[in-house]
Amino acid sequence: MTIIRVKENEPFEVAMRRFKRTIEKNGLLTELRAREFYEKPTAERKRKKAAAVKRHYKRIRSQTLPKKLY
C-alpha cells in the first residue's frame, strides 16, 4: 500500500505528483492493468515470448554497424 504524507502548506498538485511517481516506481499500475482481465496461461507465454524476440532483435540491431550508403 502506498502512503504519501502531505506536508504542511504543500499544494495538492505536488502531493499528487509525488503519489503518481511512487506508484509508477512500485509498478502498481502495470500490475493492475495486467490483472484487469484474465489472460490464459498460453496467451501469457505467447505474449512474453514475442516480447523477448522483439527485445532480442532490437539488441542485435543496436549492436550491428550500419551499412555504408554510397
Swiss-Prot record:
A Gene Ontology term for the protein's cellular component: ribonucleoprotein complex
Species of the source: Burkholderia orbicola (strain AU 1054)
Designated name of the protein: Small ribosomal subunit protein bS21A
Disulfide pairings: none
Keyword Ribonucleoprotein: yes
GO biological process entries: translation
Record carries keyword Ribosomal protein: yes
MF annotations from Gene Ontology: structural constituent of ribosome
Cleaved signal peptide residues: none
Name of encoding gene: rpsU1
Pfam families for this protein: Ribosomal_S21
